[in-house]
Design a protein with these regions (language model features):
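Short, basic phosphate-binding NTP loop
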Residues: 1-95
Length: 95
């Protein structure tokens, strides 16, 4: 994946940004939906499933080096977050 900034991601999915403005220039080099695959410079997409809500893993992805999370509801964590109505639709828009 070509590196893109959080700002570019934000613009492509029309989300609301939660975080320090200087984080908008951070580079994202991978996008993951499995929290175990989060690594430095990745963006975690939190997906609500029937049994598991990916939002509960957002803090863990931050500790693994993720620079941003795409969420449907703000999570109590220091990671910069892009809040959207549907993370699935936003992921499609970003692609």
């Amino acid at each position: 994946m070509k590196a893109i900034t959080i700002k570019e991601i934000l613009d492509s999915c029309n989300g609301n940004f939660s975080g320090a403005e200087e984080n908008l220039n951070a580079k994202v080099t991978s996008i993951v939906t499995d929290s175990r695959q989060a690594k430095e410079n990745s963006m975690f997409v939190a997906i609500k499933g029937e049994k598991v809500d990916g939002h509960k893993f957002v803090p863990m992805t931050y500790s693994q080096g993720a620079v941003c999370a795409l969420v449907e509801e703000k999570v109590d964590c220091d990671i910069p977050q892009i809040v959207v109505e549907s993370t699935l639709q936003a992921a499609k828009d970003i692609a």
